[in-house]
Regions:
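Transmembrane alpha-helical segments in integral membrane proteins
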Residues: 173-199
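Hydrophobic alpha-helical transmembrane segments
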Residues: 9-17, 56-60, 75-79, 111-112, ...
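Membrane-interface interhelical loops and short interface/amphipathic helices
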Residues: 108-109, 120-171
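Interfacial aromatic-anchored transmembrane helix boundaries in multi-pass membrane proteins
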Residues: 24-33, 63-91
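Short helix-perturbing small/polar motifs within transmembrane alpha-helices
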Residues: 11, 15, 78-130
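Hydrophobic transmembrane alpha-helices
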Residues: 1-61
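Small-residue-rich helix-loop
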Residues: 198-242
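Alpha-helical transmembrane segments and their membrane-interface exit regions
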Residues: 40-49, 66-67, 82-94, 146-147, ...
Length: 242
């Protein structure tokens, strides 16, 4: 049964509001912070069941709500949560008809590679944005880790701990990126399972065991590793994080 446009966009609005509430749940205390991890689930459900247009509406509403609550979290939500879902939905719903009359959908391996590329692009932009700070991105990351450890321990950290933080700080942005990619995959897969179970899926569920990645992520990884080995400063730190 096809939903009318008004109904579809009403559902999209509800999905956007729910997504914003999940994202803002962290303000309610540490016990609710895990709800933030499924922030993208309502957006994926709307997109995979209703299409790109409703997904855009849901993303815009969710971003607007979070921005009205606090501008900085609103920007973070728009860039880190809503926009990547909209882009993923756009690609996921691409299909073409083969010579035999069968439909071929956008490969899941490319969806995963696109998410990886998006995370890498955000990391590069963050490095450029932090380049004006003392020691660039490295200084910002090291300072943030030190502050967190001081809060957790309730005391100043020693020179040995500071040395270890400085040595391995480049891993931290990459770990955040990996966690973000994992979040995208989990929310997308859960949403596809939900809409498929309800018989509302616009595309068939792909076989995740047959995922084939394109070649370009391997070349990008090799290039960033070389820059990390021979480079230094802000560029070398960002390349190491990649």
């Amino acid at each position: 049964m096809n939903l009318g446009m008004t109904t579809a966009f009403a559902i999209a609005a509800i999905g956007g509001l729910l997504s914003a509430l999940l994202f803002l749940s962290a303000m309610g205390g540490p016990a609710l912070i895990l709800l933030q991890y499924i922030t993208q689930l309502p957006l994926f459900v709307v997109g995979l069941a209703l299409g790109l247009g409703p997904a855009v509406v849901a993303g815009v509403i969710a971003s607007a709500v979070t921005f009205l609550v606090d501008s900085l979290p609103g920007v973070i939500f728009a860039v880190g949560y809503a926009l990547p879902v909209v882009l993923a939905i756009r690609q996921a719903l691409l299909t073409r008809v083969l010579d035999g009359g069968q439909s071929e959908w956008y490969p899941p391996g490319r969806l995963l590679a696109n998410a990886t590329g998006y995370a890498a692009a955000i990391l590069v932009m963050a490095a450029l944005w932090m380049s004006g700070a003392d020691d660039g991105m490295a200084g910002v990351v090291i300072g943030a880790i030190q502050q967190v450890l001081q809060v957790l321990s309730g005391d100043q950290i020693g020179p040995e701990a500071e040395g270890m933080i400085a040595q391995y700080a480049f891993l931290f942005p990459g770990l955040i990126g990996m966690s973000w990619i994992f979040m995208m995959v989990i929310n997308g897969a859960l949403a596809q399972g939900l809409v498929s179970g309800a018989g509302r899926n616009l595309r068939p569920t792909p076989s995740f065991v047959e995922i084939e990645l394109p070649d370009w992520p391997a070349y990008a990884l090799g290039g960033s590793a070389q820059i990390w080995l021979i480079g230094g400063g802000n560029i070398g730190f960002a390349a190491g994080a990649l």
